[in-house]
């Protein structure tokens, strides 16, 4: 997969800038990259982006994903993860996006947390759009991805560097 151009849309300018620098370091300037700041909660902004740039493929990775934080802020998890995903799906469908890939999580399998529930609902939205639009939609589930923001791996690394112990969020959790 080699895109003709790449559009990075993120609410956090620092993360978007870091990604831009990483892409330019690894791939040079062979692929034109445009960075835009905005939120998937803002349907109007999404429509502006789709109308201006006409993307054909969307990789959707935006989400609140820290399990303990979402347990104490469940409404924010729903607004960002579920409603934001719905906004993005609707805008993509309205602007003739051909393929939509949602990055999900292993926590969406028989969810036991607010975050897991929101991601499972997002997967169900993906299934609905896949069955009712011309857009090819898929959700892919990942576990803890090394080097990703919000992964438990950096926490484990820091605990190990300090000599332990390595702790889990819940003593009953199995990983």
Whereabouts are the PLM-identified features?
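Conserved Rossmann-fold cofactor-binding substructure of NAD(P)-dependent oxidoreductases
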Residues: 34-57
């Amino acid at each position: 997969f080699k895109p003709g151009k790449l559009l990075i849309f993120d609410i956090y300018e620092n993360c978007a800038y870091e990604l831009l620098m990483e892409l330019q370091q690894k791939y040079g300037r062979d692929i034109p990259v445009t960075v835009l700041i905005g939120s998937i909660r803002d349907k109007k902004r999404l429509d502006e982006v789709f109308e201006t740039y006409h993307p054909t493929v969307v990789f959707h990775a935006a989400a609140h994903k820290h399990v303990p934080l979402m347990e104490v802020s469940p409404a924010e998890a729903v607004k960002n993860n579920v409603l934001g995903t719905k906004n993005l799906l609707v805008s993509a469908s309205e602007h003739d996006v051909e393929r939509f890939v949602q990055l999900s999580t292993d926590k969406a399998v028989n969810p036991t947390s607010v975050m897991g529930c929101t991601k499972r609902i997002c997967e169900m939205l993906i299934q609905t759009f896949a069955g009712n639009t011309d857009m090819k939609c898929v959700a892919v589930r990942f576990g803890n991805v090394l080097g990703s923001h919000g992964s438990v791996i950096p926490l484990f690394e820091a605990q190990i560097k300090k000599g332990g112990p390595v702790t889990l969020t819940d003593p009953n959790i199995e990983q």
